[in-house]
Amino acid sequence: MSKNSKAYRAAAEKVDRSNPYTPLQAAKLAKETSSTKQDATVEVAIRLGVDPRKADQMVRGTVNLPHGTGKTARVAVFAVGEKADAAVAAGADIVGSDDLIEKIQGGFLDFDAVIATPDQMAKVGRIARVLGPRGLMPNPKTGTVTPDVAKAVADIKGGKINFRVDKQANLHFVIGKASFEENKLAENYGAAIDEVLRLKPSASKGRYLKKITVSTTTGPGIPVDPSVTRNFTEA
């Protein structure tokens, strides 16, 4: 929805930007301000009090959302032999090695996550310039470089999300769909915030959660009170 459209302006008027909401209130308002016939994605944007240029202030992690994302992720796996068979059995959408690399080099990017066994990473490095900028490069810290590809596939299919602070100290992640009940959105939000807080760098000084906004892909940003770090489903 265009920010200049009548529907967007009407939705934005429902948001009191001077008064941050609780997570549950924000989830309810996000549902109300999503004016699209499609089931819009609900997203969270956080401004962190870190300097991502410094290695000791990088925030990167994963979390299993208790209610999933509302979308079944397409997963690509780099593996061979028994590991490849295990990935297929777990529901991976595409599995390969050199053949998959060639396909990606040719422009194939029809997947949302990439997993690799450790022995495949030297090969996967050949397409790092393709996967890296899209946030798809497998990494041990996010559990996507692992010998247990079956578990990794199951986790991602079940609603595991990855997040990483960008150069402007912002984090972005999905917490569900507008069709979710607000309680479920708030619980997903809480699970993600708990993990972000757990990963707070010791070198980060001052306020860590500086600004939080919840929105749908088609709706206005809704400010959330950063001080609410417990009891996420209370109004």
Swiss-Prot record:
Pfam families tied to this protein: Ribosomal_L1
Assembly and interaction partners: Part of the 50S ribosomal subunit.
Function text: Binds directly to 23S rRNA. The L1 stalk is quite mobile in the ribosome, and is involved in E site tRNA release.
Cross-referenced PANTHER family: 54S RIBOSOMAL PROTEIN L1, MITOCHONDRIAL, LARGE RIBOSOMAL SUBUNIT PROTEIN UL1M
One GO cellular component, as annotated: large ribosomal subunit
Gene Ontology molecular function, alphabetical: rRNA binding; structural constituent of ribosome; tRNA binding
Gene designation per UniProt: rplA
Sequence similarity: Belongs to the universal ribosomal protein uL1 family.
GO annotation, biological process: regulation of translation; translation
Keyword presence, rRNA-binding: yes
UniProt-listed InterPro entries: Ribosom_uL1_bac-type, Ribosomal_uL1, Ribosomal_uL1-like, Ribosomal_uL1/biogenesis, Ribosomal_uL1_3-a/b-sand, Ribosomal_uL1_CS
Disulfide bond sites: none
Domain of life from the UniProt record: Bacteria
Name of protein: Large ribosomal subunit protein uL1
Organism of this sequence: Mycobacterium ulcerans (strain Agy99)
Keywords carried by this UniProt record: Repressor, Ribonucleoprotein, Ribosomal protein, RNA-binding, rRNA-binding, Translation regulation, tRNA-binding
Region feature (Disordered): 1-22
